[in-house]
Amino acid sequence: MLHRTSAVARVSVPPSRAGPSLMISLAAATLALLVAAIAGGQTPAPQLTHSIATPLTDSGKSRADTDKKPSDTAAAATKTAEALPKWFDELAVNAFVSTAYEYNGNRPTNGVSSYRVFDFSDNSFNLDVAELVVQIAATKPNDAGFRVDLAAGNSIPQITKTQDQNAAQFDLQQAFASYIAPLGSGLRFDVGKFVTHLGYEVIEGYDGYDDNYSRSILFGYAIPFTHTGVKASYAFSSKVAGMVEVVNGWDLLRDNNRSKSVGAQLALTPVAPLQVLLNWIGGPELANNNHSNRNVFDLVAILKPTSTLTLGLNGDYGKENGTSLVNPGSDATWKGIAGYATYALTSKFSVALRGETFRDEDGVRLGTGTNATLSEGTLTPAYKFTDHVLLRGEVRYDKANQPILTKRGTLADKQTTVAGNVIFVY
């Protein structure tokens, strides 16, 4: 798949290939917790599983177990392994949890920080996301596989509210099947729901998360989150790869009109330290409207001049026919640019900087109805305790060209937030 490479040395966890019983237990238990949290907001008490007919010995094992011979146990394990389908060995299960606290100096009366994507709750501890990923990876010609990302948490409504306008705290973030046709180096097809190819930043998961805790303005207001459809990707060489897709549009499980959107990506690696992604998506996105095309051109560049320094650049330009709120009947345009720098001071401690500006010339993307410009600067130190646990702090300052940011019972042109974030990856 054509995604940008990791910008810094992150918590790196390969797909877990635990035994079938462990994987089934983990998946079932996690799904049960997610469903229980959604349905009732409480976790059910654990149930006793030992039968009265097989009481436990002092060692914690049942008498039936202690009577078994080692040879019997080994034979039973061998028979069980032989009975399982071969694809079970390829099944991988991974998990990702992000939780945080954030405080907004503007102290908005509604408790919501303005123009934030996922970190919008002021003065609150939040479970941003808990994610379980189950997959069989397709990696070579003739391989077939699938991936399902189950996600729950406070950040999920920001994604699901754009899908038929229904917000929920549970989402199939991704769910797609894959096949690599034996053509050349391998022509890959993915069918289902998948995250967008646009943008420098990503929706977090076990196999990738951003250097900053909060998301950029470009991530939230210039580009889509997800797509549902089909895409084909092909690596022409080690330096050039491409992808094309036909999808329902922006963040839609079910299309809202009769037209489809088309996307494309050209990935270039001219030299080892530099990667450039040229992205585009276009098509009608308004409900019951097959004529007002929306086009977004997206540039991502990543340069790693040393083993400890990563530089990034993201630029976006968008246009939609006849939707301006400033000049009704005219086309709406928006544009933005973001710069990134991440420096690893040690193998465990790093510091990330981000600066960006976003101009919504026709008031459509930010929803102000005016020609608004919003800029921000963010500092994020991070400490990796283990390969599975990361702690981050963050200070962010937002500045607008007009009072559009909530402050107590009024509006202001700036806001400052501080946050602490813990990530667990398995």
Briefly describe each language-model feature range:
Residues 1-21:
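N-terminal secretory signal peptides that target proteins for export/translocation
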Residues 2-7, 26-115, 426:
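N-terminal periplasmic/intermembrane-space "pro-region" immediately following the signal or transit peptide
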Residues 48, 118-119, 156-159, 163-165, ...:
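Outer-membrane beta-barrel pore domains
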Residues 89, 93, 140-142, 154, ...:
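Short coil turns and loop connectors of transmembrane beta-barrels in diderm outer membranes
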Residues 104-125, 155-271, 275-284:
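Surface-exposed coil loops of outer-membrane beta-barrel proteins
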Residues 117-154:
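Glycine- and aromatic-enriched membrane insertion/assembly motifs of diderm outer-membrane
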Residues 124, 140-141, 222-227, 250-259, ...:
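Solvent-exposed loop/turn segments connecting transmembrane beta-strands
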Residues 130-134, 175-177, 230, 263-264, ...:
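Membrane-embedded beta-strands of outer-membrane beta-barrel proteins
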